[in-house]
């Protein structure tokens, strides 16, 4: 008799995706982040659902509804901080997941990669709208500054901004629609994740060598389920440490002041996971130029498969490319630091140099080094 997990119409989909899935025998811990992202998404949807039961999306009551959740709702403080710090965990896993794809050449699975880039944009949009909901000072001014960037679009810019705002400034209409979209997007993201996995399972996983591993595959369960559970425990431990010991470490103290349109905070800055892009935006002294650079800093991921010049897929056996990759990682950390600093000397020039280096590495140096390594190996 056939096992039910192989014959049942629904269970056989689960079986072929998570149980009997053939996986390369050599994939390292860098391949854990996909499953961790799935857990993060589930956690965010769950905590978000319970928060939405107590939250009100009206400018007069939004801030007080969040304090009510923290003070009066059973374990409301825990729900709120799990949701806020869960977003940070989500982005840590996202950036490591993308970094893994860059290092090991996983971007050559173009459909999976492009779907992943669209997912990254969707998650960033969701996180931005979520940051507006507590209606603190940084929520309000962050929303004002970032949405106002669209006014740099020639001809239609101003109309577009007022259309998004639902008025002539960030107000009730803006908060209500941001809440609606913030609630809706994670479910759309869940559907997109399924498409991402569908594309991945068409080709199978890449591995650290970058060489096809069809001759040496092992079942996903129990080998990688147990490996993923270890990663999960480590992430949950880090998240709980953050939530229970330093819940506000990654937040902005300004957001504990109710939104006040008449009082601008001295330093408007987004959450830490957007600081690198914010630094690139600020490094260009022109509004439209800054907006284009901001979009390009993420959209550049789409063209990475086109910039692959090496005859080897992975960077495992390419030491010069490895140096360049880690230079890029250090550059992104530098940009993240600069994004949180005031606009004054020497931060301005450091940010400009780091921004130039970011695009230079990806567009010019990586492809050239790939060609050079081919030549060194006499290919």
Curated annotation (Swiss-Prot):
Cofactor annotation: heme b
Stored InterPro entries: Cyt_b/b6_C (IPR005798), Cyt_b/b6_C_sf (IPR036150), Cyt_b/b6_N (IPR005797), Cytb/b6-like_sf (IPR027387), Cytochrome_b (IPR030689), Cytochrome_b_C_euk/bac (IPR048260), Cytochrome_b_N_euk/bac (IPR048259), Di-haem_cyt_TM (IPR016174)
Binding site for heme b b562: 83, 182
Keyword rRNA processing set for record: no
Ranges annotated as spanning the membrane: 33-53, 77-98, 113-133, 178-198, 226-246, 288-308, 320-340, 347-367
Main location: mitochondrion
One biological process term in Gene Ontology: mitochondrial electron transport, ubiquinol to cytochrome c
Entry annotated with the keyword Transferase: no
Signal peptide: none
Chain residues that bind heme b b566: 97, 196
Miscellaneous comment in the UniProt entry for this protein: Heme 1 (or BL or b562) is low-potential and absorbs at about 562 nm, and heme 2 (or BH or b566) is high-potential and absorbs at about 566 nm.
Subunit and interaction comment: The cytochrome bc1 complex contains 11 subunits: 3 respiratory subunits (MT-CYB, CYC1 and UQCRFS1), 2 core proteins (UQCRC1 and UQCRC2) and 6 low-molecular weight proteins (UQCRH/QCR6, UQCRB/QCR7, UQCRQ/QCR8, UQCR10/QCR9, UQCR11/QCR10 and a cleavage product of UQCRFS1). This cytochrome bc1 complex then forms a dimer.
The name this protein goes by in its record: Cytochrome b
């Amino acid at each position: 008799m056939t096992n039910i997990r192989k014959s049942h119409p629904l269970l056989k989909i689960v079986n072929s995706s998570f149980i009997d899935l053939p996986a390369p025998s050599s994939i390292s811990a860098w391949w854990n982040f996909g499953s961790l992202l799935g857990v993060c998404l589930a956690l965010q949807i769950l905590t978000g659902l319970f928060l939405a039961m107590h939250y009100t999306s009206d400018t007069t009551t939004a801030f007080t509804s969040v304090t009510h959740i923290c003070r009066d709702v059973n374990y409301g403080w825990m729900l709120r901080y799990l949701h806020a710090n869960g977003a940070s965990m989500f982005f840590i896993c996202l950036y490591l997941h993308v970094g893994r794809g860059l290092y090991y050449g996983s971007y050559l699975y173009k459909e999976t990669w492009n779907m992943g880039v669209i997912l990254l944009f969707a998650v960033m949009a969701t996180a931005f709208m979520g940051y507006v909901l507590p209606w603190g000072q940084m929520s309000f001014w962050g929303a004002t500054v970032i949405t106002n960037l669209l006014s740099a679009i020639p001809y239609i810019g101003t109309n577009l901004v007022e259309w998004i705002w639902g008025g002539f400034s960030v107000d009730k209409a803006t908060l209500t629609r941001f809440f609606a979209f913030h609630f809706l997007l994670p479910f759309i993201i869940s559907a997109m994740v399924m498409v991402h996995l569908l594309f991945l399972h068409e080709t199978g996983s890449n591995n650290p060598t970058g060489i096809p591993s069809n001759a040496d595959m092992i079942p996903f369960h129990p080998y990688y389920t147990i490996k993923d559970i270890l990663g999960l425990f480590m992430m949950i431990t880090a998240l709980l440490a953050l939530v229970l010991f330093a819940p506000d470490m990654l937040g902005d103290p300004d957001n504990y002041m109710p939104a006040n349109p008449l009082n601008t905070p001295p330093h408007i800055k987004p959450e830490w996971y957007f600081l690198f892009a914010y630094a690139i935006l600020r490094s260009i002294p022109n509004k439209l130029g800054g907006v284009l650079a901001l979009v390009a800093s993420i959209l550049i991921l789409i063209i990475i498969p086109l910039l692959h010049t090496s005859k080897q897929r992975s960077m495992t056996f390419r030491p010069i490319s490895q140096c360049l990759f880690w230079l890029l990682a250090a550059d992104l950390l530098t940009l993240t630091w600069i994004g949180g600093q005031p606009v004054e000397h020497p931060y301005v020039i450091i940010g400009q140099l780091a921004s130039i280096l970011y695009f230079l590495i990806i567009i010019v140096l990586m492809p050239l080094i790939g060609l050079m390594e081919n030549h060194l190996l006499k290919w």
